[in-house]
Regions:
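Contiguous beta-strand/loop segments that form the cofactor/metal-binding neighborhood of enzyme cores
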Residues: 2-205, 211-259
Length: 259
């Protein structure tokens, strides 16, 4: 295409509206909350407001931090644009670099590199600042020989490569999306499909797959290993420590349903 050969895709979120999460003591369960049912298959733990809504996403027992919280949205854009959906390998690093003493378990800063056929996908996420790649708080960039397509929820633009001042293609200034938000459109589509029994634009298969890709980034981070993935078998190759993190580990009496 006009961008030339795509060599790298970047996907990122810089979340400046979330800052340090102060440590809170455990507390009685609020009235009206069935806390045992809320925990579900997760390990038993005293009630703590930090582990409840909204901040449960920063604890490994329930979620995966920004890698899964935002990764399922932005990596989805990236894979769709790449037209490659199954990584061969992934490695990741990161930690609590911005807020080392706060209450979160998941990293406030993380990087992951996914390997595909003749192309790499790079993930970046951090908390407390909002000026990410190309000045955007979130987005996906398809970096080609002639130019870079930058996309986020608000619109898109093309930045031309210009070695020695000679542009390889025509740049495209920011074109704002306009119209309804993507979230509203997804909700409308989902509700419509409940009535028509059609497949939603974001099907359960798509959602499950992109969640798996994001989780692989966290598994690489938590093990400190480069993870190799067999897409046909749906399993980690040659790494039992990593493979254990792909398996359900439910608290009794919960169990993974068998269909």
């Amino acid at each position: 295409g006009k961008l030339g050969k795509i060599r790298t895709v970047k996907s990122w979120v810089y979340l400046d509206w979330k800052h340090e999460l102060p440590v809170q003591p455990d507390a009685p369960v609020p009235e009206g909350v069935d806390y045992d049912f809320w925990l579900g298959p997760a390990p038993k733990h005293p009630f703590n407001i930090n582990r409840f809504h909204f901040n449960f996403r920063w604890y490994w027992d329930y979620a995966g931090g920004l890698m899964t919280d935002w990764g399922v949205h932005l990596l989805d854009y990236a894979l769709y644009g790449m037209n490659q959906y199954v990584p061969k390998s992934v490695m990741s690093t990161g930690g609590k670099y911005a807020f080392p003493e706060d209450a979160r378990e998941t990293p406030d800063t993380q990087y992951a590199i996914y390997e595909f056929d003749n192309i790499g996908l790079i993930w970046e996420s951090t908390l407390g600042i909002g000026k990410g790649n190309y000045g955007r708080a979130h987005g996906v960039a398809f970096i080609g020989h002639n130019g870079t397509l930058v996309v986020d929820r608000g619109g898109w633009e093309v930045i031309a490569e210009s070695p020695q001042g000679q542009e390889r293609m025509e740049a495209v200034p920011l074109i704002e999306k306009g119209g309804e938000s993507g979230l509203d459109l997804h909700v409308k589509n989902f509700l419509q499909c409940m009535k028509t029994r059609e497949t939603p634009n974001a099907s359960i298969e798509i959602g499950g797959h992109i969640a798996r890709v994001a989780q692989l980034g966290n598994i690489a981070l938590r093990t400190g290993h480069k993870i190799f993935w067999d897409g046909d078998k749906g399993e980690v190759v040659g790494d039992e420590k990593a493979a254990q993190l792909t398996r359900a580990n439910y608290r009794a009496p919960w169990s993974l349903p068998k269909l």
